[in-house]
């Protein structure tokens, strides 16, 4: 969970109102291999240890709340998997609450937009704050599937990566077709609040 000012997300409407936002990670068991959408906040910010990893400024701004047993490797264990079972990691974008544990998955194929990789490893000055390079600096030699737009991951329409740039230069969302549930749209940070969907663009 992150806690921060709603005004950041609604072009300063309701500024000063502090909301809690879940840090979502998704485990998708597909016949072609186990897939993750986002890896959440780094394990190092767990149990009140944020400042030693993110620094005081980021911790004060985002106020993360995370127990060690809420990190993605522990969630995988709860469902009977290990980090080595993961075949694909689709990362919505490289911000600190979405790409924090990429380095846990050296055996996976990492699916990202080319523009996002460039923005994360060589960020512009005004974009640097939410990219934590040490989250993924040791992942430079991982196996990347670098995209330039939408992509049908398995070629059957069951998992489609959608280019939803805006929040970052290479933000991507995921459309997943489930047999019993139907089609789900995993938006990442493309839509935060009902106001965004109604036309109030994210701040």
Q: What is the predicted function of each stretch?
A:
Residues 2, 43, 94-96, 117-118, ...:
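Solvent-exposed loop/turn segments at secondary-structure junctions
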Residues 100-106:
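Metal-dependent catalytic neighborhoods of phosphoester/phosphodiester hydrolases
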Residues 37, 92, 112-113, 166, ...:
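Active-site flanking residues adjacent to catalytic metal/cofactor-binding acidic residues
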Residues 42, 62-97, 104, 113-165, ...:
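Metallo-beta-lactamase
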Residues 8, 47-50, 122-125, 196-200:
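Short aromatic-enriched loop/helix-cap "lid" or pocket-rim segments at secondary-structure transitions
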Residues 2-74, 173-190:
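Conserved beta-strand hairpin/beta-sheet module of binuclear metal-dependent hydrolase folds
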């Amino acid at each position: 969970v992150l806690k921060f000012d709603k005004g950041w997300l609604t072009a300063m409407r309701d500024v000063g109102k502090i909301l809690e936002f879940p840090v979502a990670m998704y485990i998708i068991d597909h016949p072609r291999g186990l897939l993750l959408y986002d890896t959440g906040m780094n394990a190092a910010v767990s149990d009140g240890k944020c400042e030693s990893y993110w620094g005081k400024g980021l911790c004060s701004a985002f106020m993360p709340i995370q127990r060690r047993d809420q990190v993605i490797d522990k969630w995988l264990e709860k469902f009977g998997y290990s980090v080595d079972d993961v075949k694909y990691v689709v990362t919505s974008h490289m911000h600190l609450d979405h790409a924090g544990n990429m380095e846990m998955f050296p055996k996976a194929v990492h699916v990202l937009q080319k523009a996002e990789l460039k923005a994360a490893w060589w960020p512009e000055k005004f974009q640097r704050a939410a990219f934590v390079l040490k989250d993924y600096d040791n992942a430079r030699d991982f196996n990347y599937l670098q995209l330039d737009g939408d992509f049908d991951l398995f070629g059957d329409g069951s998992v489609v990566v959608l280019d939803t740039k805006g929040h970052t230069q290479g933000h991507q969302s995921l459309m997943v077709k489930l047999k019993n549930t139907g089609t789900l749209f995993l938006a990442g940070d493309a839509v935060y609040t009902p106001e965004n969907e109604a036309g109030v663009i994210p701040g």
